[in-house]
Regions:
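Transmembrane beta-strands of outer-membrane beta-barrel pores
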Residues: 134-136, 153-155, 169-171, 180-182, ...
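Transmembrane beta-barrel wall of Gram-negative outer-membrane proteins
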Residues: 170-193, 207-243, 251-279, 315-316, ...
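Signature of Gram-negative outer-membrane beta-barrel scaffolds
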Residues: 322-435, 450-451, 455
Length: 458
C-alpha cells in the first residue's frame, strides 16, 4: 500500500483461522522538482531575440488546411515576416530567405516548404522543440547572416509503445514510438502524405490549372540508444518529396534528404561533449514536354557532408565555456539542361560542378559576473575554400570581366585550393538587471555567409 512499509511473515497453515498483522508507515522521498517562469528567465538571460518553441504551443497558431505548422509559430514572432499568404517561408528583419539557416537534427534543410509553401517540410509530431535566434546568435552557429532556426526531433518513449494518427482535409499522418530495449533503445517513425490533387480539380477551366496535380510526402526516423548515464547515441533520418504540375506537359519536383548521427559523452561533472556527422542533400528538377522536339529536363542538386564537435565546460557555478568546430564539404551540381525524350533536339549543357570546404572554430564564454551583470561573449573563425577540379577565366588587368577581356583559361586540379576566404565573427551580449523583474540588454553580432541562392524574379 501507499506509505506502508513492506512486512514479511512466515506462516504454517494447519486449519482455518485469522491472523492480524500490524503494518508500519513509511515515508517516500521524492526527487527535487524545480519550477521556473519563462518570463523571469527572459529577464535573467543575456540572449536577445531568442525564442524556444514547442509543439504544445501550436494550438495557439492558426492552421492552414487543418495542418498545424511550427513555421507559422516562427512567422508570428517579432521581426519575422512571411514571404506570402499561407506560405512557410520567412524573412527576418529585412533579410532574404536564403539568409536563414534551418537545421533539423544538425542537418541543413534547404527548402522547408511543401505544396507551394502551405505546409512546413517536417511533421510537427516528431518535433521536440525549435530554437530561433534573430540576434545575439551563439558562437556555435554560423553560415548565414540573418537568423538560425535549430529544430530538434524528439526521442521515442523507451518504456511503452505509443502512436498517433491524423486525417485532415488534404493530408494524413502517422507517428509511432517503439521501445526496442526497455529504458535503453527506442525508435520513432513518422510519416505524412497528401491527397491534394482534388483542390486543383476545383479550379475553373479558364485558370489553366484544372488539370494540374500536386502532392508531397515526408518520412522521418530517430533511433535513440542509451549506453549508460554518460554515453548515448542518436541516429536521425529524414526524407521529403514534392511534385507538382500545372498541366500535363510541365512538371516540377524537389527532394530533401538528411542522415546524421550524434553521440553525447559526459566526460566528468564539468565537461560534456557532443559529436555529430552527417549528409545533407537537396535537388530540384523541371520537365517541359509541350513540344516534343523542344522537350527538356532542367535539374540541379546540392550535396554536403559535415562533421562537428561541441563541448561545454562548466568552469564554475555561474561560468561556462563552450567551444568546438564544424566542417562541411560541398558538392554542388549547378545545373544540367538535357533533352527529354528521343524526339527532342535540345542540346545537352552541363555547368561546371562546384566543390568547396567550409570550416569554423568557435569559443564562447557565459559568465554571470554579479547577480546584476551577465556577459555572453564569443568568437568564431570561419574559412571557405573553393576546390578543384574547375576551370576559370583570367581577365585583362583593370578591365571589367567580359568575354572580350579574357586573357587565359586556368584549370585547377582535383582537390586544389583555388581561393580561400576567411575571417573572424564576433558575438557579444550583456544583461544588467536593475530589479528582479527589469533588466536592460545589449548585443552585437558579426556574421559571414559564403553560399547564396540566386532567384529569378523576372
Amino acid at each position: 500500500g501507499l506509505n506502508i512499509k513492506d512486512t514479511r511473515r512466515q506462516i504454517m497453515l494447519y486449519s482455518d483461522g485469522t491472523l492480524d498483522i500490524e503494518l508500519e508507515e513509511t515515508t517516500h522521498m521524492l526527487d527535487e522538482v524545480t519550477i521556473t517562469s519563462g518570463r523571469i528567465q527572459n529577464v535573467k538571460s543575456t540572449q536577445l531575440g531568442a525564442e524556444t518553441l514547442r509543439p504544445t504551443q501550436l494550438k495557439n497558431i492558426p492552421m492552414a488546411l487543418g495542418e498545424v505548422d511550427i513555421l507559422k509559430m516562427v512567422q508570428a514572432l517579432p521581426g519575422v515576416k512571411t514571404v506570402g499568404e499561407a506560405s512557410s517561408g520567412f524573412n527576418v528583419r529585412g533579410g532574404a530567405t536564403d539568409q536563414n539557416l534551418i537545421l533539423l537534427n544538425d542537418g541543413t534543410i534547404y527548402n522547408p516548404n511543401h505544396l507551394f509553401g502551405f505546409f512546413a517540410a517536417f511533421n510537427s509530431d516528431m518535433v521536440k522543440e525549435a530554437e530561433i535566434y534573430k540576434s545575439s546568435i551563439p558562437a556555435q552557429y554560423g553560415g548565414r547572416i540573418s537568423s538560425i532556426l535549430d529544430i530538434t526531433g524528439k526521442e521515442a518513449n523507451k518504456e511503452k509503445f505509443t502512436g498517433s494518427a491524423g486525417i485532415g482535409l488534404v493530408t494524413s499522418k502517422l507517428n509511432l514510438e517503439i521501445p526496442i530495449i526497455k529504458d535503453r533503445t527506442s525508435v520513432l517513425l513518422s510519416g505524412r502524405t497528401t491527397y491534394s490533387d482534388w483542390i486543383m480539380k476545383q479550379l475553373p477551366e479558364k485558370s489553366g490549372y484544372k488539370n494540374g496535380t500536386a502532392g508531397f510526402y515526408d518520412l522521418a526516423t530517430i533511433v535513440a540508444h542509451k549506453f549508460n548515464d554518460k554515453h548515448s547515441l542518436n541516429v536521425y533520418g529524414y526524407y521529403s518529396h514534392d511534385r507538382f504540375a500545372f498541366n500535363s506537359n510541365e512538371k516540377y519536383g524537389y527532394n530533401n534528404l538528411n542522415a546524421s548521427a550524434r553521440w553525447r559523452a559526459v566526460f566528468n561533472e564539468k565537461l560534456i561533449g557532443y559529436f555529430s556527422a552527417g549528409y545533407d542533400h537537396y535537388d530540384y528538377n523541371n520537365r517541359e514536354t509541350v513540344n516534343a522536339s523542344a522537350a527538356y529536363k532542367l535539374s540541379f542538386d546540392i550535396n554536403q557532408y559535415f562533421v562537428k564537435a561541441d563541448f561545454t565546460n562548466i568552469l564554475a557555478d555561474k561560468h561556462t565555456l563552450n567551444f568546438g568546430f564544424k566542417s562541411m564539404l560541398y558538392h554542388i551540381n549547378s545545373g544540367t539542361y538535357e533533352p527529354e525524350g528521343s524526339e527532342s533536339f535540345v542540346k545537352k549543357d552541363v555547368l561546371q560542378k562546384d566543390k568547396a570546404l567550409e570550416t569554423a572554430f568557435y569559443l564562447g564564454d557565459e559568465w554571470e559576473i554579479t547577480p546584476k551583470l551577465s556577459v555572453n561573449a564569443g568568437i568564431r573563425y570561419s574559412l571557405f575554400s573553393a576546390l578543384g577540379p574547375r576551370s576559370y577565366y583570367q581577365y585583362a588587368s583593370g578591365m571589367l570581366p567580359h568575354e572580350s577581356t579574357i586573357t587565359d583559361t586556368i584549370t585547377a586540379g582535383a582537390g586544389k585550393f583555388m581561393k580561400t576566404y576567411h575571417g573572424p565573427e564576433f558575438r557579444l551580449s550583456a544583461r544588467y538587471a536593475f530589479t528582479d523583474n527589469f533588466s536592460v540588454k545589449a548585443g552585437f553580432n558579426s556574421m559571414r555567409q559564403y553560399i547564396h541562392k540566386l532567384s529569378n524574379t523576372v
